[in-house]
Amino acid sequence: VPYYRVDITNKDEFSKLPNDVYAVVDLAGAMPARMKGYNPYKYIDVNITGNLNILEYCRKNNADRILFAQSFGDIKDYGDKNPLLRVDLPRKFSFTTDHTIYVMSKNFAVDMIENYHQMYGLKRFIFRLPTIYLYSPVDTFYVDGVERKIGYRLLIDRAIAGEPIEVWGNSSRVKDMVYVKDFCQMLYKALFVNRNCGYYNVGTGVGTSLLDQIKGMIDVFGENGKKSNIIMRPDKPNAPQYIMDITPAIQELGYHPQYNYLEMLQDFKKEMQLHKINGGGTDIM
């Protein structure tokens, strides 16, 4: 597959790309988890100007459709009262955090895509993403502009080492643990579906409690005779909770998740092992 490196904020660089495209899968974007410090101009330059350049590329080259990755930051605040997040929930997000302009920029990108859909007939498929779980050798991200270990990677590391693991807050709070390979399945189906548009939550439609998440990590990654002890800490803050309603994706795309939580962890472990075999380090035996 040919690879082109393009700065999407520079419209002139799009001349590098082929002009006989059927579909554009737009996963480009600036996000808080990958931003050192806080530079809101990046969100405007990349998520708005950059995506406008992508839309113009689609228009000029008569692309049939665009697939776009939206953040679930526009509705995730509903989850604290009712974890089931429907696709059609009105936007609701905080205006007081360093995520605000990020969420606004992604919302505006979605609105720009709708404009090109209605004005030029560009078919559009929007995918609202929560955390997508996958193995990567990069196990850090940024919180409030400061680099930290990704939470679930820290828990997996403790399970591998057989170290005690604390369960913070209400252990029954649930999260939709969607694997990257199921997200890819959804994208693939949208590439060829006979529809003009769609708006989909990415997920499994199933919630896994925090306690079951940690038990699963211990079962899959812990060594026999060296399993982590679980320490309940209800005095600590609660984890976020949400379940993505995937009904439209099931009905319109024929999407069906292939990985439940434990199957995801098992495949995650295989990917870690392959990374080590291929010379990527000493993650896990």
Give the location of each predicted region:
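Active-site helix of classical SDR
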Residues: I101, S105-F108
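Conserved Rossmann-fold NAD(P)-dependent oxidoreductase catalytic core, especially the SDR/UDP-sugar
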Residues: L52-I101
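Conserved internal alpha-helix in NAD(P)-dependent oxidoreductase domains
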Residues: Y22, Y41, D45-L52, K60, ...
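NAD(P)H-binding glycine-rich loop region in Rossmannoid oxidoreductase-like domains
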Residues: I8-V46, D77
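Active-site segment of SDR-like NAD(P)-dependent oxidoreductases
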Residues: M31-R34, F72-G79, P130-Y133
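NAD(P)-dependent short-chain dehydrogenase/reductase
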Residues: D80-P83, E114-V174, V180-Q185, K189, ...
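SDR active-site strand-loop-helix element
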Residues: V24-A28, I66-F72, F127-L129
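C-terminal substrate-binding subdomain of Rossmann-fold SDR/epimerase-dehydratase oxidoreductases
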Residues: A159-M285
